[in-house]
Amino acid sequence: MRKRNPRRATPEELRVCSVLKEKGTREELAHLAARGEWSNVPAYNASREQIADHLGKSVSPESDASFFDSRRFSEAIVLLKSRPVLLVKNGIFDEAPLAGLEQRLKKHRAALATPIRSVGRLELIDHDSMDWCGTGWRIEDDLIVTNRHVASLFAERQGSLFRFRLNQAGKQVRTRVDFREEYRQPESDEHVIARVLWIAPDVSEAPDMAILQVVKGDLLPPPLVLARQDAEPRQAVAVVGYPARDSRNDAGAMEDIFGNIYDVKRFAPGEVVGLPHDAWYLTHDCSTLGGNSGSAVLSIDGGEVVGLHFGGQFRKTNYG
């Protein structure tokens, strides 16, 4: 009889398994399940008793992967609690839903307010179909960093320089960065993008990066500090940016994690997953969506930039 090969865990299951390795996370999730905190949604495809019983055991990653197979809502709850996407108000991110995670974050909350304020939403004026297109953040002088694929929506190369694109009516598309755009906060902090200085070539060996020049003024937030050392696996990080609704993703899981609130500044904590050999990027497990393109990946301990988020797959792997 031919021996069947064991099923390989999906990226979603591997992500959940990684999260459940964190100190105290498994026990706290089991406690929440035992208290019935998940029982009000019947579509979890697992009863609260089943979830609590499973999480209360010390099992292998393979057992976790098997348990969460096809249990989309069970998986979404693990990510909702342990990889939340926290709202930001006046530069301060909300309290995390898990006590252990909140304990790790709260001692850095005040210090992280400054770098959080230096991340903004890139907005478009006179674009044919879009009001905004991604995230950008300030570095030294009057420079804004974003992704190549974001900048290419409003700018293009012309010889050795770059110019703003024209819309269908022949009018130049203009761009600005708003460092606020927070949930239910009416204030704005808008600054005009004067020039596009550089867009990386669209080749695999080049980073997905672009450099913009903002009109310099005294009211600009302080520049972010770039980390001097490479990130390390399992280093605590957070993606700061503006996740947008993405119709390509599972609507139910997306609503569970993002709370049906999009287009505003969010703080998404997580960890560095890996640093591929000889690559210019890292992978992380923070919860992100399309509008996060161009987001800053910040070290939670020091607030320095360890990466530029440029892509990934919802509930799977992200790149920076």
Tell where the protein language model's regions lie, with residue ranges.
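Protease-domain processing segments flanking chymotrypsin-fold serine proteases, especially trypsin-like
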Residues: 1-134, 264-269
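C-terminal subregion of chymotrypsin/trypsin-like serine protease catalytic domains
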Residues: 2-26, 30-35, 39, 274-280, ...
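Phenylalanine-focused residue identity feature
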Residues: 67-68, 73, 93, 101, ...
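Short, solvent-exposed coil/turn linker segments
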Residues: 101-105, 231, 295
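Serine endopeptidase catalytic core focused on the charge-relay Asp
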Residues: 111-126, 130-133, 137-141, 145-290, ...
